[in-house]
Amino acid sequence: MKGKKYYSDYHVWIEPIHSRIVKLGLSSQMREHLGNILHIDLPSLGAFIKEGEKLCILESSKSAIEVLSPVSGEVLEVNTALEDDILPVNNATESEGWFVVLQLTEDFRSESFSLEP
């Protein structure tokens, strides 16, 4: 499971790190649809994010959207480098452009997600 990426209906990729720890980011397919990302508003360290609720806000050349979380958990790590340099979201969406690392409320269930965006 570690190293694989899974994709949600919310256009967010999920990379399991441990059974209850995952890294989240925007699918490259959605990034292409949005156009050039200009700004991101990320959650705070320690915040609790619920499945289906706001994970972050992205402002692009086309629109501003709320990105919804595909899972529930506490924010363990935030990619704060994106606040100073948004380029990784545009150029390395599914690697250096990750948003947060979450500690899930329950074990990650890969069968709920797709292996393709």
From Swiss-Prot:
Gene3D superfamilies noted in UniProt: 2.40.50.100
Protein name: Glycine cleavage system H-like protein
InterPro entries assigned to the protein according to its UniProt record, in alphabetical order: 2-oxoA_DH_lipoyl-BS, Biotin_lipoyl, GCV_H, GCV_H/Fam206, GcvH_Chlamydia, Single_hybrid_motif
Cofactor stoichiometry and binding remark: Binds 1 lipoyl cofactor covalently.
Spans through the membrane: none
UniProt entry tagged with the keyword Zinc-finger: no
Family: Belongs to the GcvH family.
PANTHER family, alphabetized: GLYCINE CLEAVAGE SYSTEM H PROTEIN, GLYCINE CLEAVAGE SYSTEM H PROTEIN-RELATED
Coiled-coil positions: none
Any single GO CC term annotated in Swiss-Prot or TrEMBL for this entry: cytosol
UniProt keyword annotation of Nucleotide-binding present: no
Single Gene Ontology BP annotation: glycine decarboxylation via glycine cleavage system
SUPFAM superfamilies registered for this protein in UniProt: Single hybrid motif
Ranges of residues in domain Lipoyl-binding: 21-103
Cofactor(s) it depends on: (R)-lipoate
Domain of life: Bacteria
Native organism taxonomy: Bacteria, Pseudomonadati, Chlamydiota, Chlamydiia, Chlamydiales
Modified residues (N6-lipoyllysine): K62
Pfam families linked: GCV_H
Keywords attached to this entry: Lipoyl
Organism listed in the record: Chlamydia trachomatis serovar D (strain ATCC VR-885 / DSM 19411 / UW-3/Cx)
